[in-house]
Structure formats: C-alpha cells, structure tokens
Curated annotation (Swiss-Prot):
Residue spans crossing the bilayer: 29-49, 110-130, 182-202, 268-288
Keyword Protease: no
Membrane topology per record: Multi-pass membrane protein
Residues in the Cytoplasmic compartment per record: 1-28, 131-181, 289-361
Protein name: Innexin inx1
Lineage: Eukaryota, Metazoa, Ecdysozoa, Arthropoda, Hexapoda
Annotated family: Belongs to the pannexin family.
Keywords for the protein's UniProt record, in alphabetical order: Cell junction, Cell membrane, Gap junction, Ion channel, Ion transport, Membrane, Transmembrane, Transmembrane helix, Transport
InterPro entries registered for this protein in UniProt: Innexin (IPR000990)
A Pfam family: Innexin
Organism: Schistocerca americana
Amino acid sequence: MYKLLGGLKEYLKWQDIVTDNAIFRLHNLFTTVLLLTCSLIITATQYVGNPIHCIVNGLPVRPINTYCWITSTFTMPDAFLRQVGSEVAHPGVANDFGDEDAKKYYTYYQWVCFVLFFQAMLCYTPKWIWDSIEGGLLRTLIMGLNRGLCQDDEKCMKKKALIEYLLRHIKRHNMYALKYWFCETLCLVNIIGQLYLMNHFFDGEFFSYGLRVVAFSEQSQEERVDPMVYVFPRVTKCTFHKYGASGSIQKHDSLCVLPLNIVNEKTYIFLWFWYIILAALLSVLVVYRAVILAVPSVRPILLHARNRMVPKEVTNAICRKTDVGDWWILYMLGRNMDPMIYGEVIADLAKKIETPSSNNP
C-alpha cells in the first residue's frame, strides 16, 4: 500500500512549463490524488481487514457478516434523540416494532471506495482534455527560454523565431484560449456535479453535512445529534430470516459494528469542506475569465502585472493589435520565460506589430 501511495506523488511533480492555472491544478492534480488516496485507504481497510462485525445468537457469525454487508443495515432515526445507556443501547439502535417505513437503511458503505475512484477519474478528465488540446504548443514556443542560460547567438535566434511565429499567427489563437477556459469551466461543472452525486449517494444527507458538524459543538448536550454518527453510524441493526426445523420462517436480529465508518466520516467531512472551497475558487476563476473576455481594457493591465519590466505603453500597444487568444499566449509566455528575455520579446514584438507589413513577413 505504501508503494501505491508513493506512486501518487508523481502526479504532483513540479512542471517546468506551466500551461494552466493554479486553481486548475488544485482541481485536476491535488483533488485527484486526494480522492485516490482516500479510495486506497478505504479499500485496504475494507478488503484487508473486516469491515463489519455482527452479533447474533444461535447462528454462525461469518454468514451473517457477509449477508448484512452485501444487503444493508438500518437504524431508527428517532432513536438518535434518546439517551444512550438508558433508553437505547447505541445511537439509532432501537426496536422497530415492525414499522418498516421508520427504518433508515444504509447501503452505501460497500461502494465508497469505487465511488471515490470514479470521482478521481472525473477530476482528472479536464486535465486530460486540455493536455490533448494544448499539444505542447507553449513548450515548442519557449524553446528553452525559460531558463535564460543559452548563448547570445542562440537566444537571438530563438527570440526571432518566437516573434516571427507570433506575427505570422496573430489573431489565430482565440480557440486555444477559449478551449482552455472551457476546461476551467468544466472543472466547476464537475465539482458541482460531484456535490450532487455525493448528496444522492448519501440519501440527501451530504449538502448539509459540514454545516451540521460545525453546529454540533454549539448545541446543548440534551438536544444535539452527532451528524457524523447519523450519516455514518458505528453500530446498526440487520435482520436475517431463515427456515426453522418445522419449515416456519424465523427472524433473527443482529447488532452490527461498522468500523469502516470511522474512516468514512473523517474522509467525507474533509471532502465536504474541500469541495466547497474548490467550488468557490472555481466560481471566482470563471467570473474572472468572463471579465477578461468581455472587458478588453483589463488585458494590458494584467499583461503589465505579469512582468513589471514591460512598460504599460508597450502592453497597451500590443493589446490594441491582438485578440484575446494572442493576449493569452503572451500572458502564459510571461509565466514561463525568463523575465529579461520575455521583456525583450515583448518590446521587439510591440515595435514590429505597429508596422502594417509585419503581419505578413
């Protein structure tokens, strides 16, 4: 297991050429690794240990454990408000008195590791799509100018090739930028969709899960119900039917301990907060991209902020002659190139872009 977890760090390696945004990487890399780690830990706990222990009189324990694991267990919701030790044996565990409608069934626990793995794949999908679309364009354009260690002749040759490319392909990068911003929007759609998925998976209990956990400590001892125990009960009931010696159907109640829910409750309270934070960050990012797209006047400001060595007059001149896609290419070049070389490229580009014939070398 340690080897498997150690292999996940490869996804978090620093990229020498950055083609995306930090929030984009939080979604695609960190969240993917987080979900895969949780899935591996829960899988190891579930299939290496014993995820359920049922107590029943007069029947072999192993078949009962298997039956209750693959079917479902239940609690009585009204029993969570009763006093443990005097009114009920455990939170949520009480006599059902034959009232099937009052039972709350738990069927999720055997699927948690698979759902987490599926969520990890969903989080990685936008990165896979973007890597396929990007195709190494920025790496090709930079040509090692991110390190600034090349000889003067080599540097001049690479700068000239880069400027010629930018002039030749001016106003042809809009789809490049729009496809990347689409992938960022896809991240937001994915996170919101996964919140709904988890809420459905936990029978409508996930949306308010984190808020109830926070409010739990502020409630009075007599009135509060631990939301983690309610959603992830440690002790539940299971009913097993079998034929007796005379052929009559016998009903056997068993008390089932679910040690795996100790891991599940901690996993999902962290995921609740992380997904809310990530959804907020992605929402701000999508609005920010919309402003860049709709308000051209902010582009030279951002381009100047990327490299303070480039005068505002130069960024204004460039942004007047280019589209949003060209601006995005220049902005990303500024994130990756040596600042001195980048300043020289922008200055030379601004001079040539003002010449009408420069667009058709």
